[in-house]
Every structure is written in structure tokens, then in C-alpha cells.
Amino acid sequence: MTSRPPLFSLTLLSACALGYEILLIHLFAIIRHHHFASMVISLALIGYGLSGTCLSIWRLPLSRLYPAVYISCIIFFGCSVLGSFLLVQQIPFNGDEVIWDKYQLVYLCGQFLLLLLPFFFAATAIGLTLYVYPLRITTIYGFDLVGAGAGSLLLI
């Protein structure tokens, strides 16, 4: 691809993704028990891993449609950040009942699937950008790291 990579939007996306992760950790520490807050990190990693798996399978068709897929992932990220958190609040999960109520594990899995969606969309946009612009990987990765650092610092 001869055009330039979308470095500014990629930086903002990375900042928002890591900021959202930190926000979820704080919210889970308040709303749920503190040990559920540490599970947010694994949620983000699962979302990124799932994205990498999908990109390894469908990278060629997705790279041909890069601008549309990139913009769609950013839009879906924004919608899923708010939507997934609101939907998770409707799931009747109670961590105290996990031991004797088998449905609580189903509710927990449902919450996990909903909450990993924003991380999946962010990682898909970032990963596809890295694939489409192979000669600019160091620059793209640098802007991604700057965005992640900025997103962390702004929330702390």
C-alpha cells in the first residue's frame, strides 16, 4: 500500500483501549470483588489473541478492504466500549454463588465474551495496520506504544 498509515487515529485507539482496560479494573474493584478486577487483564489478552487468530486466518481478504475494515473496527470499538459494559450490567452474575449455582459460570462467561469485544476490535485495527504497512512497522508500533502509555497516564 502506497498511502501513509493512520498513525494519529492508531495512537488514539491504543490510548482508548488501554484506558478502557484500566477503567474496567477500577470499576470491577468497586462493583465486583477485587479478585475479578485482575481478570480484566486476561480479558484484554484474550481479545488481542482472538484478533490475532482471526487476522492470521483472514488477513488477505481483510487487507484488501483495509480502509473500510479499519474504520469499522474503530466504530465497533467505540460502540462496544459502552454497549458491552451496559449489557454486562444486565447479566445476573453473583460471584458469591459460583460454588453452588452452575449458571453463575455461564453468566461469567457471557460477561467475559461481551467485555472482550472492545479489545478484539482495537487489536484487529492495530494488527491489520501492522500487516498492511510492513515497511513502517517500527513507526506504527512506536505510535501504538505512545498511545498506550498516554492512555494509562491520563487515567491515573
Language-model features, listed with the residues they occupy:
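Alpha-helical transmembrane segments of multi-pass membrane proteins
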Residues: 1-156
